[in-house]
A protein has these predicted regions:
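Loop/turn elements at helix/coil->beta-strand transitions in domains of secreted/extracellular proteins
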Residues: 1, 52-54, 91-94, 122-125, ...
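Serine-hydrolase catalytic machinery in alpha/beta-hydrolase-like enzymes
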Residues: 1-50, 164, 169-175
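Alpha/beta-hydrolase-fold catalytic nucleophile elbow
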Residues: 4, 58, 96-99, 128, ...
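Primarily recognizes the serine-hydrolase "nucleophile elbow" in alpha/beta-hydrolase
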Residues: 29-120
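Acidic beta-to-alpha connecting loop that harbors the catalytic carboxylate
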Residues: 101, 131-134, 162-164
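Short beta-strand/loop motif that positions the catalytic acidic residue
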Residues: 121, 127-129, 133
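Conserved alpha/beta-hydrolase "acid-adjacent" motif
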Residues: 134-140
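C-terminal catalytic histidine-bearing segment of alpha/beta-hydrolase fold enzymes
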Residues: 142-196
């Protein structure tokens, strides 16, 4: 399922100051949409022929931040329940963050944005980024990786020298083009799909 989530209509600076108490309002709309979507997938799993215990999230850039958010903020719904879809778990079973942003607060110790409090219950995570990403620098993934490792969460990270930002699924001559196969292999190693 593809989620097109709501974003705040406020003026937004993509070079966001992610430090706590930065004076910027935090919107819960994207996270609410992610929580609701996972609930709907689980509610309709039999009807849609999907395994309710193999539901994951994948996001690019700001969507990568949403991946981290739903992976760490799933204990309670941020909205009033609508129906039975909101009674089950909205914790993803795995997470893939591709050049995620807004995870590192910019310090020298790679402190994680406090809006993504990693715990042992955070799902297994795959991170991917290019070192020459000028939008969301590699420190975003590194900070999240360190927090996941400290919490004992299974995590795999791949850094590429070239690829920039927003390489997505485009075929290029760069090694980063092969990242979907790495994710597929990883999904097999964590039991989400049959191992190759």
């Amino acid at each position: 399922m593809l989620l097109k989530y709501r974003v705040p209509s406020l003026p937004y600076d993509w070079h966001c100051d992610c430090r706590p108490n930065n004076g910027l309002a935090k919107s819960t709309l994207p996270l609410e949409d992610a929580q609701r979507t996972i609930g709907l997938l689980r509610l309709h799993a039999a009807e849609w022929h999907i395994d309710p215990h193999k539901i994951g999230v994948l996001g690019f850039s700001a969507g990568g931040y949403l991946v981290a958010e739903i992976s760490t903020d799933f204990a309670r719904r941020l909205y009033e329940p609508v129906d039975a879809a909101d009674k089950g778990s909205c914790r993803p079973d795995f997470a893939v963050g591709v050049y995620p942003g807004h995870l590192w607060i910019g310090d020298e110790t790679y402190s994680l944005n406090p809006n993504v409090p990693v715990t042992r219950q955070t799902p297994p995570t795959f991170l991917l980024q290019a070192e020459n990403d000028k939008v969301d620098g590699v420190n975003q993934s590194v900070a999240y990786y360190i927090a996941l490792k400290k919490a004992g969460v299974p995590v795999e990270m791949h850094l590429y020298a070239q690829g920039g930002h927003a390489f997505g699924l485009r075929r290029t001559t760069l090694p980063v083009t092969g990242w979907p196969q790495l994710v597929e292999t990883w999904l097999g190693t964590i039991g989400m799909i049959p191992a190759n």
